[in-house]
Structures are given as structure tokens and as C-alpha cells.
């Protein structure tokens, strides 16, 4: 474990930073928040009102010059990920980017291609760090006959983003599939490997709220359903085996086996990827505590392939 104090900064002072990244940083004695950038400078200043030592501004370059951070979180809208990530990598700074990696596959590829990306860039996709995922994977990986992933949320009616960019197709890059799909697809790929996308249906082009994706994992059929305008909360994956249905309920933090036994986890996965990456940088964990940019790109290529199916356009995973 390193004794060095980690100078932490962030780009984007909205809901994701406030609810996830900032509490994770504050929970670590080795991390000091030194800077915060936001396009709305008053928002950043108001948020840091009780932390006068924290530099605030609107320029990522100035942030790097003025605060000399060791670690930067990028919590901006999807179309504004690439610039701060690449600036951090150019400066040799560890950077944790929110999912998806970018609003477009082209921008995501540009980030992955940076020489420092493999070492320094991580992506916040937390479901693979859920404490029940390993026992679930051990239970279902070899005998899966059918996979169903259901993701339902009231979306922005509950989330209430500080900046209303989710309804801007250019900024978001997509709808519910690009917003929530990476969480589900990353978990499924962690268990079953890369999928083949066979069909995709969306309720509306560009900014879909509801989507169904049919895939297969080495011949095992799988369906992903996402509803970002639901009146309920559900995040669960059900795998059918010869023994029956095994359910990993990420909302209730339960693994419900086909034999009726239930295993519970003490905490949910929401902060897991951020915590793992922060612990990697501070030296509290091994260097394996992150989702790499390459892995995030592979997930985004699955999303792009699904969008291609919905449009009737071939989008191979390459």
C-alpha cells in the first residue's frame, strides 16, 4: 500500500459526481479533492462552498495545470468524455471515465488507441464487481440453457440529472440501450463471453426508452429487456439450467438458486467499480480492480451491433 496522498480532481459536477464519485473519494483517507471542472461554474462553486481549498473552473487544461492531480474522474455527458480523458492521458494522469466510454464508437476507439489507455484508463461499469457474481457465474456458466436480463427504471423521473442532456440525441449518442445496456452486457460478457447479436427492437429511433435485444452466447439464447420509462425498479438476470431458474437480483442483492436457497450480499454494486479503481490508484488493491477501456469498447461494439440490427444495417463486432 502506498503512503502517498492522491490528489483527486473531477470533470463534471452533476448527479453522478455528487452521488457516486465524491462519496467514494471522501471515504478514502489517502485521497484529497483538489479540483472540480464544470461547464456551469456556479454549480461547481456552490457544490464546493464548504471546501474553499478546492480549485474550480471550466477548463480541463487549467485544472491539470493548477491542481496537478494524480487521478481524474470524468462525469460529463457522453459526448464530452473524450476531450478530458485524452487530456488526462496526455498528462500521464490516471482517469476513471463514466460509461459508456463515448457517445460514438469512433470516439471510443480514439480513447482506446491512446498509448497510456491500457495502464491509466478505467471505466465505471460496476455490475461485474457485485459480490454475488462469482457464485452466480460458477452456478450457471456451464449449464445455461436460456438467459433473461430485465432492467426497468423510471429513468430521469427519479434520477433528475442536473443537466437535461439525456433527451439530446447528439449529446447522449443513444437512448436506453447505450445508457443502461453497458451495465447488463458487461455482466453477461463477464459470465458467458462475447455474444452474437441476432435482433433488436426499439420503441423509437435515436432516443429509445424501451428496447429488446436478442443475443446468443455460444449457442445459448439470451434476451435483454430495458425499460427506462417503467413504473417499477428491476435489475435481474435469470439463467435457466437443467435444475431450474437461478436468479441474480441486483436490486435486492440476492442470489436465488433453483433449489430454493437464497444468498444475500451486504451491499449493492453501485459504487463497486469506482471503489475498485480508486483503491487500485491509492495502492489499497491489486492493479486488476478496473474495467479497461478495451473491455468498455467491446461492450459498446455490442450496443452498436444491436442498434445496427434495429436499423436493419449490418454492424459487425470488429
Where are these regions (language model features)?
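Short, conserved SAM-binding/catalytic segment
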Residues: 46-53, 111-116
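Beta-loop-alpha module in the N-terminal Rossmann-like domain of NAD(P)-dependent dehydrogenases
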Residues: 40, 55-112
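N-terminal Rossmann-like dinucleotide-binding module
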Residues: 1-51
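Contiguous beta-strand/loop segments that form the cofactor/metal-binding neighborhood of enzyme cores
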Residues: 185-254, 275-285
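Hydrophobic residues in well-ordered beta-strands that form the structural core
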Residues: 96-97, 121-123, 248
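C-terminal helix-rich "cap/oligomerization" subdomain common to oxidoreductases
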Residues: 1-2, 62, 71-73, 218, ...
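Rossmann-fold dehydrogenase core element
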Residues: 108-126, 144-149
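Predominantly a Rossmann-like dinucleotide-binding segment in NAD(P)-dependent oxidoreductases
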Residues: 127-196, 313
Amino acid at each position: 500500500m502506498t503512503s502517498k496522498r492522491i490528489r483527486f480532481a473531477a470533470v463534471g459536477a452533476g448527479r453522478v459526481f455528487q452521488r457516486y464519485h465524491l462519496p467514494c473519494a471522501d471515504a478514502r483517507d489517502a485521497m484529497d479533492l483538489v479540483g472540480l471542472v464544470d461547464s456551469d461554474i456556479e454549480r461547481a462553486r456552490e457544490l464546493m462552498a464548504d471546501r474553499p481549498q478546492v480549485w474550480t473552473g471550466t477548463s480541463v487544461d487549467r485544472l491539470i495545470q493548477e491542481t496537478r492531480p494524480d487521478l481524474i474522474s470524468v462525469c460529463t455527458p457522453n459526448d464530452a468524455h473524450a476531450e478530458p480523458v485524452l487530456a488526462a492521458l496526455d498528462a500521464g494522469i490516471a482517469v476513471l471515465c463514466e460509461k459508456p466510454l463515448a457517445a460514438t464508437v469512433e470516439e471510443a476507439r480514439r480513447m482506446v488507441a491512446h498509448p497510456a489507455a491500457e495502464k491509466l484508463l478505467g471505466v465505471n461499469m460496476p455490475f461485474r464487481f457485485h459480490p454475488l457474481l462469482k457464485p452466480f457465474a460458477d452456478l450457471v456458466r456451464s449449464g445455461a440453457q436460456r438467459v433473461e436480463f430485465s432492467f426497468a427504471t423510471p429513468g430521469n423521473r427519479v434520477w433528475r440529472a442536473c443537466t437535461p442532456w439525456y433527451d439530446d440525441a447528439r449529446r447522449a449518442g443513444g437512448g436506453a440501450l447505450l445508457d443502461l445496456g453497458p451495465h447488463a452486457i458487461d455482466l453477461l460478457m463477464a459470465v458467458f463471453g462475447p455474444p452474437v447479436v441476432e435482433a433488436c427492437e426499439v420503441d423509437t429511433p435515436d432516443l429509445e426508452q424501451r428496447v429488446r435485444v436478442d443475443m446468443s452466447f455460444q449457442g445459448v439464447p439470451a434476451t435483454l429487456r430495458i425499460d427506462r420509462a417503467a413504473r417499477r425498479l428491476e435489475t435481474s438476470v435469470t439463467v435457466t439450467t437443467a435444475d431450474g431458474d437461478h436468479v441474480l437480483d441486483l436490486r435486492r442483492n440476492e442470489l436465488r438458486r433453483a433449489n430454493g436457497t437464497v444468498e444475500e450480499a451486504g451491499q449493492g454494486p453501485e459504487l463497486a467499480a469506482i471503489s475498485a479503481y480508486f483503491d487500485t490508484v491509492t495502492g489499497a488493491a491489486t492493479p486488476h480492480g478496473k474495467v479497461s477501456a478495451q473491455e468498455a469498447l467491446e461492450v459498446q461494439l455490442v450496443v452498436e451491433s444491436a442498434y445496427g440490427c434495429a436499423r436493419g444495417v449490418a454492424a459487425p463486432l470488429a
